[in-house]
UniProtKB/Swiss-Prot annotation:
Signal peptide: none annotated. InterPro entries: MKT1_C, MKT1_N, PIN-like_dom_sf, XPG/Rad2. This is Post-transcriptional regulator MKT1L. It comes from the Eukaryota.
């Protein structure tokens, strides 16, 4: 019997997420580490981390339900709210007192997950002397390559199953037809006329049957059905007219599996179109390119022609194409000159960023001056292997203007960063405003429009999971940090640095959150198919082309390394004259390796090209597999191409020319190379042709005769843990981030160096790591067998500051979320099935916690029988939101009478009876211990130990709900974000503590920092950054105008806000995934994929609102220009912030939101006693003083009255109307 205000049971306070895990080693399987410095080679860094799990005590798994105020998902910041005193083993390495913190053992990183290598036995290159042969008859040369062993997960083999094989229902639809991913007009079916996923059986990753987490066959998973273009499109367009007679498009050979002559047995999804590769062409290249130049900034856009494609990646420094392991891992590689400004005069000169000079030094590799730095594009261009032709050559004979556009698979990472470089030419300080400015989205739109004008329909394919690699590539060098500090110093002094300084200091990756936001924009706004590959996006693009989903391929030259004979890669399209620069793989192989080809076979040459590309890799997708040798690219090529090689194996060749002759480092180089070979050959891709699963190895797509028995058994060391196939579909559709997939398959999380690094950010990340470990634990709990606690012990945290590799301590117990009985709730009735995006968070928070029910244990359920609890999309979506907010502690789970709770809400929030949408229970005078410490090892701040505290008489979500209801829907998530930022102390009025570039563990002395930081201005302007404002030029021809304020502290603040946004977004993604995996929803995988665009917290923060308010607050009322009226002041501000349209309206929005947020914080401070606001977080009368200042500035600029405090907690004297 539950009594009012009490917990359901004594275990509901199990939100203790303090760091209590063991010392953790670097993850064994699969990590890729990108560059973060413009002139940086990959250097093997053997971190001597190996953990030996010692568990003196076996802790039984407990289901900890929520305490009435289970606010502890962030660990230390939240644990101090309603948690018992923690033992002294919270965060950090080597902290005494923890049974989980056993001393780490040490072993070379690259030996993690691998058996001892046996001596090489075969001759020739491609032979790593390994444990298995990674080549197959008829497909690859006889060159076995070692990729390591020791993994116990039999990829490609069928594990033991209960009750035999799955039910075997065909999987409908095609992977190219996810919701909103079609083109704007139907493009017809693919080659063959059959449904794309015909004859597919639900099964596991890489050919293994798909299993539920309890070991039974998972018969619920199916790929999305064909839905056409957009949300409400029909199930598929009628077949197009028969394709013209003759050879397939672009000269693809009949019988090659592409085109009418090939044995294709599947149709193109609505987003597909038949076609083949490109045609032949001139071997010359139209432009001269200078190499060996310094990192000069490109010339102005006025002299550049429009270009589409991935031009000359070789002209970039290795780290400029800075993908991360999350999306290619998640962070797009860079390349210049992808898009021009429209309406500019053409010029024959393409401005491509240049390679670093040989005088540049590379961290960790002082003796590497003779290492190869030439990029693959340069290498091929110098040999006349870049073909040039007109785009018309890529269209089929007889193609008319009314025929459907050709589908082009585009490397999304490469493309997006190329557009970022165009933005850099317009505004070299673009990143100070936002990592996703509107101008970048405008460039994306222009890119799509230009391609469509040329009758090309793009398919953006983003990178997925990566391969393990060199952790030292994460390090940001001291020189780069010093350059950043110098640029910031100039900006703070009012001086604009030159473009070369800015580019050298801030060669930043975009981030997976930006990439996924762009993918959602492509799908929702532009109708472009945008997907995330399971692993290497080039492999998925090849699969698309092989199976007729795409007609053409557009990507970097490194795509030639894939063993696909029918490959012609477009690297650039000049819009001004329709010329196309492309690479023909067959021609390249025959020209480079004439001694290793026959008239009909280039397999051996392809193997040599793969070795050459991996040894000299400059592309970020391969950088973690690059081995640095004391040879130039030409010298490497000469050894690989000669008919009489000096070395019997590639392993011997690498060992002989390694920069370091230490045995351990040379072994690491060999493993890196072999991992790269395996990653290129065995990346998993979605396929329409597999007999048993749509997710197969690339080699099986290229050679359908290969079976599971032909596949290696130790690929876990390259690709990671086995997970349900449905998770890869979720990643494919953009619902589940690659960051989360990396954590659950490859056991690590990564954080990149921010634009403005602060000690506060380091502290914040440490706090958020506890939440992230709990979030990951939620999905591991659903899929892991053995239990998830074993898998979470292996999680590692990779970051840019020392120590670069840290343990990601697991929570003692995982949060056990309740289910919800909502089928008859009023809140559900308010949701429109067709307009779920219009949901109200206030309505979600008004659901009484009495509707929650303890989850039924999986072990108690009969096999294959999962009760359906949520019977529609709106029920499922509401349950996802309820579970997410429950995870954050927004439901008290008390049994207080509804009338008592409602009366309390009306009294505290000043709400009439008709205004309330439901009841939010509150706890009554419970006891809790609030604690906080500081762990020196992991540098995590804990709040001061304050002892026992009384629970507040009013529960904080009541104030949040009331505030949301009083504001527009488009800012509702911002108030939730505000609450979470306050809870972890990111919102405060203290100046940021900037990191000392000479020592990333030390902050710059406050005496050396600018002290123009009025605490009221800091607090108000930071809050204003949570408002999203438009900021873009009204016309392309307008000159760029710098905004009047550059705030280093606002930039540093938004870095922390962005980290919080990512955590919250990952939370709702994981909760969505767990609802699907639990099997208690009637929704299909397609239905879940549609949630990706409407789940909250997907926005990327911007400083524009904060910059605008900061400018208003720090200047006198006349702006030193004798302005006497509000109209004059607004007009003056509009001139300063020209790119903010309708400035008066947006200033009203910013100031109104900031005041409402201050009222909310004031309510938290007064009536929820340190549940949200720490005692020393906002001291004195800072909140009241800031409100006073805001009111005064409101009088100076806005005509109507400011918003009042809807909570009726601010002094009544401030509620009087303001005279005009």
């Amino acid at each position: 019997m539950r009594k009012a205000g009490a917990n359901r049971n004594n275990e509901r306070q199990g939100r203790n997420l303090g760091q209590q895990g063991p010392q953790m080693s670097p993850p064994g399987p699969s990590m890729m580490y990108p560059h973060h410095h413009q002139h940086q080679h990959h250097h093997q860094h053997q971190h001597q981390h190996q953990h030996q799990h010692q568990h003196p005590h076996q802790h039984p798994h407990q289901h900890h339900h929520h305490h009435p105020h289970h606010n502890g998902v962030y660990g230390n910041a939240y644990d101090n709210i309603r948690q018992p005193q923690m033992p002294p083993h919270s965060f950090g390495q080597g902290v005494s007192g923890s049974p989980w913190n056993s001393p780490p053992q040490q072993t070379p990183m690259y030996n993690q997950g691998y058996n001892q290598m046996s001596p090489g036995t075969g001759g020739g290159y491609g032979d790593m002397g390994g444990m298995y042969r990674d080549v197959h008859g008829g497909q690859y040369p006889s060159s076995p390559s070692h990729m390591g062993g020791g993994a116990n997960i039999p990829y490609g083999r069928n594990p033991a199953m209960h009750n035999g094989l799955p039910a075997g229902a065909p999987l409908p639809g095609g992977y190219g037809a996810l919701p909103h991913q079609g083109a704007h007009t139907p493009m017809g079916f693919g080659r063959g006329g059959q449904p794309l996923m015909e004859h597919m059986q639900p099964s596991g990753m890489y050919g293994a049957p798909m299993m539920r987490h309890d070991g039974y066959p998972d018969t619920r998973v199916s790929p999305p059905a064909q839905v056409g273009y957009g949300a409400g499109a029909p199930v598929g367009p009628p077949p197009p007219p028969p394709m013209p007679a003759g050879p397939p498009y672009g000269g693809v050979l009949p019988g090659a599996g592409v085109g009418p002559g090939g044995p294709m047995n599947a149709s193109r999804p609505p987003a597909g179109i038949g076609g083949g590769g490109g045609g032949g062409g001139n071997a010359g290249y139209l432009e001269m390119r200078a190499r060996g130049m310094g990192p000069q900034m490109p010339a102005s856009n006025a002299s550049r022609p429009p270009r589409i494609g991935t031009p000359d990646p070789g002209m970039m420094p290795p780290n400029r194409m800075n993908q991360s392991p999350m999306m290619g891992q998640g962070l797009p590689p860079q390349v210049g000159n992808f898009m021009p400004l429209p309406g500019v005069s053409p010029s024959p000169h393409a401005m491509i960023p240049t390679t670093p000079s040989m005088g540049d030094t590379f961290p960790g590799d002082d003796a590497n001056m003779s290492g190869s730095t030439e990029a693959l594009y340069d290498f091929l261009h110098d040999r006349g292997l870049v073909s040039v032709d007109n785009i018309s050559k890529f269209f089929p004979e007889g193609y008319g203007k009314d025929d459907p556009a050709l589908k082009v698979a585009v490397d999304g990472n490469f493309c997006l960063t190329s557009l970022r470089d165009e933005l850099r030419k317009r505004d070299s300080l673009w990143f100070l405003h936002s990592t996703l400015p509107e101008e970048l989205l405008m460039l994306v739109q222009q890119h799509v429009e230009w391609m469509r004008n040329m009758k090309l329909e793009p398919i953006w394919v983003f990178n997925g999971l990566s391969v393990s690699g060199d952790v030292e590539t994460f390090l940001t060098t001291e020189a780069e940090l010093r350059a950043r500090d110098a640029v910031w110093s100039k900006l703070e002094d009012g001086e604009i640095p030159d473009e070369v300084e800015i580019q050298e200091a801030f060669d930043q990756p975009l981030g997976e959150d930006v990439q996924m936001a762009v993918a959602r924009y492509l799908k929702e706004e532009l109708g472009v198919m945008a997907v995330t590959a399971p692993f290497l996006n080039w492999a998925q693009m090849v699969a698309f082309h092989k199976e007729g989903i795409a007609d053409l391929l557009m990507g970097p030259p490194e795509m030639l390394l894939l063993p696909y004979d029918e490959m012609k890669v477009i690297v650039q399209i000049d819009v001004s004259n329709s010329s196309v620069n492309y690479l023909d793989r067959d021609r390249v192989l025959r020209a480079l390796f004439p001694n290793h080809v026959t008239e009909t076979n280039t397999r051996v040459a392809g193997d040599r090209l793969m070795d050459l590309g991996l040894i000299t890799a400059t592309h970020a997708a391969l950088s973690s597999a690059r081995v640095t040798l004391n040879l130039s690219m030409q010298e490497v090529y000469e050894e690989l191409s000669t008919p009489t090689p000096k070395f019997r194996s590639i392993k011997d060749f690498i060992n002989a020319h390694a920069c370091s002759q230490e045995t351990g480092k040379k072994a690491g180089l060999s493993i890196k190379h072999s991992k790269g070979r395996g990653y290129l050959r065995y990346s998993a891709v979605f396929s329409t042709k597999s007999r048993d699963t749509p997710l197969v190895y690339l080699v099986r797509v290229l050679d359908p005769d290969l079976t599971n028995a032909d596949m290696p058994t130790n690929l876990a060391g390259v690709l990671g843990h086995l997970v349900p196939l449905s998770l890869f579909y979720m990643q494919f559709s953009g619902l589940l981030s690659v960051r989360i997939m990396t954590a659950i398959t490859q056991s690590y999380l990564r954080d990149e160096c921010p634009v403005s690094d602060t000690k506060d950010y380091h502290t914040t990340l440490g706090l958020l790591m506890t939440m992230r470990s709990q979030v990951i634990g939620q999905i591991l709990k659903r899929i892991a067998h053995p239990p998830p606690i074993k898998r979470t012990e292996c999680l590692s945290w990779v970051r840019w500051f020392q120590p670069i590799l840290a343990p990601m301590d697991r929570p003692r117990d995982l949060i056990d979320l309740d289910e919800w009985e909502i089928s008859d709730s009023d809140q559900l009735k308010k949701l429109d099935e067709d307009c779920l995006a219009d949901y109200s968070i206030a309505s979600v928070l008004s659901v009484t916690a009495d509707a929650s029910r303890p989850a039924v244990e999986e072990s108690n359920r009969p096999a294959g029988r999962v009760p359906i609890r949520y019977n529609s999309k709106r029920e499922t979506f509401l349950a996802i939101l309820l579970k997410s907010f429950d995870f954050l502690g927004y439901f008290s789970h008390s049994t207080a009478p509804n009338d008592a709770v409602d009366g309390m809400e009306m009294e505290c929030c000043g709400m009439d009876g008709h205004d309330r949408g439901g009841s939010v229970p509150a706890a009554y005078h419970e006891k809790d211990l609030s604690s906080m410490k500081r762990s020196e090892a992991s540098d995590i701040n804990f709040m001061a130990d304050e002892g026992l505290k009384d629970y507040p008489s009013v529960y904080f979500p009541i104030y949040l709900r009331a505030t949301i209801k009083a504001n527009p829907l488009d800012v509702q998530a911002s108030f939730v974000l505000l609450t979470e930022l306050v809870r972890v102390r990111i919102i405060n009025s203290n100046p940021c503590r900037y990191i000392n570039p000479a020592n990333q563990q030390v902050e710059i002395s406050m005496d050396d920092q600018d002290t123009n930081s009025d605490s009221r201005v800091l607090l108000a302007s930071r809050i204003a950054c949570l408002v999203k404002l438009p900021y873009r030029r009204a016309s392309e021809n307008l000159p760029f105008v710098w905004a009047p304020v550059y705030s280093r502290h606002l930039c540093a603040f938004t870095v922390m806000v962005r980290a919080m946004c990512r955590c919250l977004r990952e939370l709702v993604e994981v909760i969505t995934s767990t609802v699907f995996l639990s099997g208690n929803s009637s929704c299909s995988l397609q239905d879940f994929a549609e949630f990706a665009s409407i789940l909250p917290f997907g926005d990327v923060p911007s400083t524009i609102g904060g910059l605008l308010l900061h400018y208003v607050l720090v200047f006198p009322s006349d702006y030193q220009a004798n302005l006497t009226s509000r109209e004059e002041r607004i007009e003056y501000l509009q001139g300063k912030f020209r790119d903010i349209p309708d400035l008066a309206d947006h200033l009203h929005l910013v100031m109104s939101f900031t005041l409402q947020a201050l009222y909310l914080i004031n309510a938290y401070m007064l009536n929820d006693k340190e549940t949200i606001v720490a005692k020393d977080q906002l001291t004195g009368t800072i909140v009241e003083d800031t409100i006073e200042m805001m009111w005064q500035k409101w009088r100076d600029h806005i005509d109507d009255n400011p918003p009042g405090d809807i909570h009726n907690l601010y002094p009544p004297r401030h509620q009087e109307p303001i005279p005009h």
